[in-house]
From Swiss-Prot:
Hexadecanoate binds at T61, S93. Signal peptide: none annotated. Keywords: Lipid-binding. Residues 3-278 form the DegV domain. The keyword Aminoacyl-tRNA synthetase does not apply. Pfam families: DegV. GO terms for molecular function: lipid binding. The keyword Cell inner membrane does not apply. It comes from the Bacteria. This is DegV domain-containing protein DR_1986. May bind long-chain fatty acids, such as palmitate, and may play a role in lipid transport or fatty acid metabolism.
Length: 281
């Protein structure tokens, strides 16, 4: 039984990376200045940030329609027996709901998974699923593996400001970090499928040190890890600084990644983070 994988643009894997894996990415939408743009197709994260910095209002986001997922599934099933569809947390977006509605049209040939995470947290699950497909595992076997990995996975990041999360209603438990003293940097986690408070420190240098130390603890606790480094536009130097602090640590390096337009709408420019998974489930 051949298996095709479908995901959405919040995996923040580039179109080239998805194509190399044979994975289909369905874009979410950014509503910006009264126009709807497909994430990464019609609007890049850099264009979005440049617009906001020029004084345009912070945009909002929207999920793909069930019809768009149905089209992606139909195309995938032209050359595969089954589809495994992996998506952003249902507590952060209605995307997985659209995917499930579309899946009903295909008589059990499409399995939709809420990964309970976003950006490279989702991206790492897509990469693992692609590896397991190549290894010959079935859809139920892959889903079982992902369900074992998810509770152990971690996504931790810091943002330049909480305003973007607050204005778009995605702040969740991180609302406890609103306000406070000047130069206090929030540390955020995606936990249980939602954004939550991970703590706060004074100054960006300490925030980056916290991210690096978090990776060290995770690698120690899990006997190794897959680690992806991520940043929104403006956070590239800070991402490199976190990586530099880990130059002596052994882990499976999953690369540097730019967060796309949809997640940037919520995280804002200058965000930096790490996505982590155990090496094996």
């Amino acid at each position: 039984m051949s298996i095709a994988i479908v995901t959405d643009s919040t995996s923040d894997l580039t179109p080239e990376h998805l194509a190399a894996l044979g994975v289909t990415g369905v874009p979410l939408y950014v509503l910006f200045e009264g126009q709807l743009y497909q994430d990464g197709v019609q609007l890049s994260a850099r264009q979005l940030v440049e617009g906001v910095r020029a004084g345009k209002a912070i945009p909002s986001t929207s999920q793909p329609s069930p019809a768009e997922f149905a089209q992606a599934y139909a195309q995938a099933l032209e050359h595969a027996d089954e589809v495994l569809s992996l998506h952003i947390s249902g507590q952060l977006s209605g995307t997985v709901g659209s995917a499930r509605l579309a899946a009903q049209e295909f008589g059990g040939r499409v399995t939709v998974v809420d990964t309970h995470t976003v950006t490279l947290g989702l991206g790492l699950q897509v990469l693992r699923a692609a590896e397991l497909v190549r290894a010959g595992q079935s859809v139920p076997q892959i889903v079982q593996t992902l369900e074992r990995v998810y509770p152990q996975a971690d996504l931790r990041f810091t943002v330049d400001t909480l305003d973007f999360l607050r204005l778009n209603g995605r702040i969740g438990g991180a609302s406890a970090l609103l306000g406070g003293l000047l130069n206090i940097k929030p540390l955020l986690v995606v936990r249980g499928g939602r954004v939550d408070a991970g703590g706060r420190v004074r100054g960006q240098k300490k925030a980056l040190a916290d991210l690096a130390e978090h990776v060290r603890r995770y690698v120690s606790q899990h006997g190794g890890a897959r680690v992806a480094f991520l940043a929104t536009v403006g956070g590239e130097e800070d991402r490199a600084a976190v990586r530099a602090q880990l130059s002596d640590l052994h882990f499976q390096d999953m690369g540097d990644h730019e967060i796309g337009a949809v997640v940037t709408v919520h995280a804002g420019p200058g965000a930096v983070g790490v996505a982590l998974e155990p090496l094996s489930a």
